[in-house]
Design a protein with these regions (language model features):
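Charged, low-complexity
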Residues: 24-50, 119-122, 135-294, 321, ...
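Small-residue hinge/turn detector
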Residues: 66, 84, 96-99
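Conserved SF1/SF2 helicase motif Ia
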Residues: 295-302, 307-339, 419-422, 547
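Conserved P-loop NTPase motor "coupling/switch" region that bridges the ATPase
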Residues: 311, 317, 322-324, 339, ...
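Conserved helix/coil segment N-terminal to the catalytic DExD/H
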Residues: 317, 356-393, 404, 414-415
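Conserved helicase ATPase core of P-loop NTP-dependent helicases/translocases
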Residues: 359-362, 549-553, 561-562, 566-607
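Interdomain linker/hinge connecting the two RecA-like lobes of the SF2 helicase core
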Residues: 435, 439, 448-451, 457-548, ...
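A conserved SF2-helicase RecA2
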Residues: 626-711
Length: 711
């Protein structure tokens, strides 16, 4: 038998051992990262509490009964505890009647008061909190690696332990005194080590370490950019770590305590869910699962879709066989639903709409997963479900679409009642004061409760009414569940093109004009037949229902003009390059004074610089911008100090068009932008991502897709 190369084997064994140690260290460092975050949160909470001292009178010192001459402090100009905290010992000592003992007592009392405030303080992140934001972002990155590497880590540990426990493979001396059986064992073990260290599995493990190191060392600029793009993820992480407290009374709202405890006691399985949930979202998912047939009415922007996906992920994880979910939604959000499900879960998606609907239906029925269809397509699939298959959950988005019990689409959906183990209706429209509409919806999910609701309808603002609704209707508002500084959330609204959109887009491709193609879905005069136009109207309707104002941005004057015509009187003003700079503030002032639901139209470059538009809390972009700075300059007009509402940003996009390519291009180049967060010449060089070569390639690609016969 040929003797193994024990020197080489020792190197490989050391590599395996080092990898195993690094893996264990990777998980151990999670505790250190969490502790660092808690300490940084404590510092910020203390700072915030200290800032609040200005709101408390120096008279608070009297309550300590420490004999402090409060009147002398007031006479010297110290009116608040904040004034005292900011003063030096020498400044306080100069006040007549205040000696060292009183200074010591004052410092102790003010410190204790500040500490008590910080205990209940909600950490409110600001861009300047670079240390905490960076620590959170690094933790997110590292935790994802730890989660993804879980199975590999266990496998590596088992093999490392096995190798470490074999004395014969480590020492050539054993070979000299071993019989043929032990030598054969040693050769087999050596062969295993060579194979293992060259395997794809071991390579993947080493790849995890590279990703982990990247996460540990990512820059503060990258972290700040991520925070500005989606602060909600940072707050969700803070909440999950216990560094900020969810507003529990409003998570449950008026749900009776016994029911709330029953719901909260449900063990939510998120093993198949990829993302972070806020406390109120966890409760919402549990509510959906525990109550089975419900109406989720959370205010727009609180993540009803994510809660529904979390519930689906739980059902899928606990099921023994395949699951069937059916989502019915407006056509304008079909693509969005598919992308969200794929983003936050491992559930297969099937779009039941348009050409190929029968084939997609058959594959969904056979393979399981989530089918997504629009109201208009229900007639084509209902016969295939009714009395033929079971649905683990039926989800009706924008449920007010079926408020009319006599409408054909309502009758189609009601036929699936007996086939659905769970039914979830979703709407962001407040229904408490629309009792008849609510009863029509409740009659679908809980017909036994309709008469009870109607019996107390005349006291719709009293606790009895809410308690009657509690088992079937859950609604939370932003002001109730998001107590921190308002986060900004961005959503991609993928709108499937209409026939008019497609025809106009094909004509634009024929011109080979990049600028014309960018106006996809806004090229035709009549935007009522535009997919983006329809979705824009829906979003503006939601703004009216929620009592919010919206800013609509486009790079193009023609688009602004056509959207103005579409919106009509709800548009309070237009800011474009044609409007003189001195007139723009007057338009902003008029918008600020306008009624809720009003819309301001802005050309990106005209309305993106030098204006404060805090009156708006909804921002809609009609197309992707060629420079990230254009987008963020526009957003900064709304999302800035003084904004008291959560800001929701919608990007209107059409799949299989120039929009999709531009979004991908932006994502590919994001790392370059993260390196140059500040405005500078260098930032500008990285900012202009749409170079001529890329544009030419894109036009060629679109031409081949839509005009394959045109040379």
């Amino acid at each position: 038998m040929k003797k193994p190369d024990f020197k080489e084997l020792k190197k490989l064994i050391r590599a395996i051992s080092d990898a195993d140690a690094a893996c264990k260290n990777m998980y151990a460092e999670g505790d250190l990262q969490r502790e660092q975050i808690r300490q940084l949160c404590g510092q910020i909470a203390a700072r915030q509490a200290k800032d609040k001292l200005d709101g408390y009178s120096v008279e608070e010192l009297k309550k300590s009964k420490a004999g402090i001459r409060v009147s002398a402090l007031i006479s010297a100009g110290y009116n608040t505890l904040g004034d005292i905290a900011a003063a030096s010992d020498g400044e306080i000592r100069s006040i007549e009647g205040i000696g060292d003992k009183q200074i010591e007592a004052i410092r102790r009392i003010v410190t204790e008061f500040a500490n008590s405030l910080s205990q209940g303080e909600t950490v409110k992140l600001q861009r300047e909190d670079t240390g905490l934001i960076t620590a959170l972002f690094r933790y997110m990155k590292c935790e994802k690696v730890r989660k993804d590497a879980g199975v590999a880590s266990k496998g590596l540990s088992e093999q490392a332990t096995r190798i470490a426990g074999d004395p014969f493979i480590r020492n050539g001396v054993h070979w000299l005194f071993s019989g043929s059986e032990l030598k054969q064992h040693t050769l087999e073990m050596a062969d295993f080590i060579y194979t293992f260290t060259e395997s794809e599995f071991f390579g993947n493990v080493l790849g995890f370490f590279d990703l982990y190191q990247e996460g540990k060392t990512c820059s503060s600029d990258e972290a700040i950019r991520a925070f500005e793009k989606n602060g909600a993820d940072f707050y969700a992480l803070l909440e999950s770590l216990g560094s900020i407290k969810g507003n529990r009374p409003f998570v449950y709202d008026s749900i009776p305590m016994m029911l709330a405890e029953e719901i909260d006691g449900l063990d939510l399985d998120l093993s198949g869910f990829t993302g972070n949930l806020r406390a109120y979202q966890v409760f919402g998912a549990k509510y959906i699962l525990n109550q089975k047939d419900v109406l989720l009415g959370d205010e727009m922007g609180l993540g009803k879709t994510v809660q529904a996906i979390a519930a689906m992920a739980h059902i899928s994880a606990r099921a023994e066989g395949i699951c069937h979910f059916l989502v019915v939604c407006p056509a304008s959000v079909l693509v969005n639903w598919g992308r969200e499900i794929e983003k936050f879960s491992n559930i297969r998606t099937f779009t039941l709409h348009g050409a190929g609907i029968e084939d997609s239906f058959d594959r969904w029925k056979q393979q399981g997963g989530a089918a997504i269809t629009n109201y208009e397509s229900m007639g084509k699939i209902v016969d295939g479900i009714d009395n033929r298959m079971k649905l683990n959950m039926l989800i009706i988005d924008e449920a007010h679409y079926i408020k009319n019990p006599d409408a054909q689409r309502t009758r189609y959906i009601r036929r699936l009642d007996n086939e659905s183990e769970r039914i979830l209706l979703m709407t962001g429209t407040p229904l408490e004061n629309r009792v008849e509409e609510m009863c029509n919806l409740l009659d679908f999910v809980r017909p036994d409760m309709t008469s009870q609701i109607r019996s107390v309808a005349h006291i719709s603002n009293l606790p009895e009414f809410k308690q009657k609704l509690a088992p079937v209707y859950l609604r939370r508002t932003r002001s109730q569940v998001l107590t921190e500084l308002p986060p900004i959330s961005e959503k991609e609204e993928w709108c499937s093109m209409t026939a008019d959109d497609t025809a106009a887009y094909i004509a634009a491709i024929g011109t080979k004009s990049f600028q014309t193609m960018r106006r996809v879905s806004f090229l035709q005069e009549d935007l009522t037949e535009s997919a983006k136009g329809r979705r824009l109207l829906e979003l503006c309707d939601e703004a009216v229902a929620e009592g919010r104002k919206a800013v609509v941005y486009s790079f193009y004057r023609e688009t602004i003009a056509r959207v103005h015509k579409l919106l009509g009187k709800r548009c309070s003003g237009v800011i474009s390059g044609d409007v003189a700079a001195e007139e723009r503030q007057g338009i902003i002032d008029a918008f600020s004074d306008a009624k809720e639901g009003s819309v301001l139209l802005c050309q990106v470059q005209a309305g993106g610089v030098g204006l404060n538009i805090q009156a708006a809390s909804m921002v809609i972009f009609c197309e992707p911008q060629i420079k990230p700075s254009l987008t963020w300059q526009a957003l900064s007009r709304v999302y800035r100090m003084g904004q008291v509402r959560n800001v929701t940003v919608y990007h209107l996009l059409c799949p299989d068009t120039i929009d999709e390519d531009m979004i991908l291009r932006l994502e590919e180049k994001q790392i370059s932008f993260d390196s140059f967060a500040n405005e500078s010449v260098v930032a500008g060089a990285y900012d202009d991502i749409m170079d001529r070569e890329w544009i030419n390639d894109l036009i060629k690609k679109q031409n081949e897709k839509y005009l394959p016969t045109v040379l």
